């Protein structure tokens, strides 16, 4: 169990990305991009759908909400062009058709299926080793280290500015940002600013110590 990445190339040399989330028990999630930058997902080895279908089915409904969550990520924007759904219910039913082809379409049935597939610990479990690998690869600190901040980073608990725009993120600063449970960080790249989402996993001791200190010092 765990999360695994791959990079291939099309005939013109364009990089194609893939990712597989393998649980100890339950449905696989397989992600891939194509030559047109469309981002697809396969749920439990079924036919692929645009990633935005799955995002809608998980409750982030409209295009505007998806862009607000992920930023203007080109692969998300390209996926909109292949996504016939426009809201939560349509996304849910579109995904249900791929997982249970031929069965009667009903929102209640689709909701029940998604809940049982991914939110029932008896049917979906990464196990400790899978969770460890997942958190290690998706840790915020490793994804923002040595990057340049595109916006100020603010502690969500205190409102304190942890780092200013233009700062290069050291390992120490990356640890500080991660352990403050900052939900996302904007970084600069040559092409554009990128929103890096956190998995919100913190060093428990560091986070508890920081919260306790804040509560003791606040008037």
Regions found by a protein language model. Name each.
Residues 1-216:
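N-terminal non-catalytic structural scaffold regions of very large proteins
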């Amino acid at each position: 169990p765990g999360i695994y990445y791959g990079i291939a190339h099309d005939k013109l040399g364009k990089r194609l990305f893939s990712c597989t989330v393998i649980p100890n028990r339950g449905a696989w999630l397989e992600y891939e991009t194509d030559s047109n930058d469309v981002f697809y997902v396969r749920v439990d080895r079924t036919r692929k759908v645009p990633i935005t279908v799955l995002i809608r089915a998980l409750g982030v409904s409209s295009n505007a909400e998806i862009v607000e969550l992920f930023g203007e990520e080109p692969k998300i924007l390209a996926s909109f062009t292949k996504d016939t759904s426009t809201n939560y219910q349509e996304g849910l039913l579109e995904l249900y058709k791929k997982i249970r082809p031929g069965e009667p379409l009903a929102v209640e049935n689709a909701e029940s299926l998604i809940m049982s597939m991914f939110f029932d610990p008896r049917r979906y479990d990464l196990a400790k080793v899978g969770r460890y690998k997942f958190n290690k690869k998706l840790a915020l600190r490793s994804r923002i280290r040595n990057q340049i901040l595109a916006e100020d980073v603010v502690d969500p608990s205190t409102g304190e500015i942890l780092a200013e725009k233009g700062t290069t993120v050291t390992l120490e600063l990356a640890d500080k940002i991660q352990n403050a449970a900052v939900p996302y960080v904007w970084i600069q790249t040559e092409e554009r600013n990128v929103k890096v989402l956190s998995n919100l996993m913190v060093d428990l001791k560091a986070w508890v110590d920081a919260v306790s200190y804040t509560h003791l010092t606040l008037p």
